[in-house]
Regions:
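Bacterial N-terminal signal peptides that target proteins for export
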Residues: 1-9
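Bacterial N-terminal signal peptides
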Residues: 8-16
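Sec/Tat signal peptide C-region and signal peptidase I cleavage site
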Residues: 17-21
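Non-catalytic cap/lid and distal C-terminal segments of serine-dependent acyl enzymes
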Residues: 22-235
């Protein structure tokens, strides 16, 4: 229920004003990634008039959480029902929603270069989507959001690529400070986080949302609309 409310809020926030929708959802499609050397699965939401119009649409990249996949927002979060309702109530514009699978990559480039997921996302996935579907390619028509691991990924991408997104909605984002990360690398997620971030702290610093924000000149913060939702017990 909490995830459904989150999604309704971000759809209304990211692209407000608009039309009616009786949409189509395709689950577990895929494209070949040269950077990863494997297929990348994704699910996609197409608005009601996609097949009868020639217009291009704004896009929301919606990222899943840890242990989830490209189908979870649809099967567990009722994404289609919520998006249809928001559009029908004119609280969101007709849009395309892309939900890629990220496995347990945390949406970053692995420190040793073996799994450059972030590079794949921006250099292959986004261009593929814009070539395959009628998606607007300007910043003001592209938003990103995610839950937990996906909240971290959406937050990180908005900071690493501020020229790419007009809005970002990290939901219960799994954002850690140095102390928590060191503890996780030593104990609870030892194999995973050491594989992703490496034995030192340099790669972690480059992908630490809190450090990036603290190092940023306040006058140069990205011009992105943020909707940040975090509960008292998140963390």
């Amino acid at each position: 229920m909490k995830n459904k409310f989150y999604l309704y809020c971000i759809l209304c926030f990211l692209f407000n004003v608009a039309g009616y929708s009786q949409s189509t959802v395709f689950e577990s499609l895929s494209f070949e990634s040269n950077k990863l050397g494997r297929k990348v699965s994704y699910s996609i939401y197409l608005p009601s008039d996609y097949n009868t119009s020639k217009r291009n649409y704004p896009v929301l990249y919606l990222l899943h959480g840890y242990t989830d996949n490209e189908t979870n927002w649809i099967q567990m979060g009722q994404m289609k029902t919520i998006a249809d309702r928001a559009i029908a109530n004119e609280e969101a514009v007709p849009m395309i929603i892309v939900m890629p699978d990220a496995w347990d990559t945390w949406y970053i480039n692995q420190y040793d270069g073996k799994v450059p997921y972030e590079d794949m996302f921006f250099e292959e996935l986004i261009p593929y989507m814009e070539k395959t579907y009628r998606i607007r390619s300007d910043k003001e028509s592209r938003a990103i959001a995610g839950l937990s691991m996906g909240g971290y990924g959406s937050f990180l991408y908005s900071l690493h690529h501020p020229d790419m997104f007009c809005a970002c909605a990290p939901l219960s984002a799994a954002v850690f400070d140095d102390t928590v990360m060191e503890a996780r690398k030593a104990r609870s997620h030892k194999d995973l986080f050491n594989r992703l971030f490496g034995p030192g702290d340099e790669h972690w610093k480059q992908n630490n949302v809190l450090k990036i924000l603290s190092d940023w000149d306040q006058n140069d913060l990205p011009k992105i609309r943020y909707y940040i939702d975090c509960g008292d017990d998140d963390g």
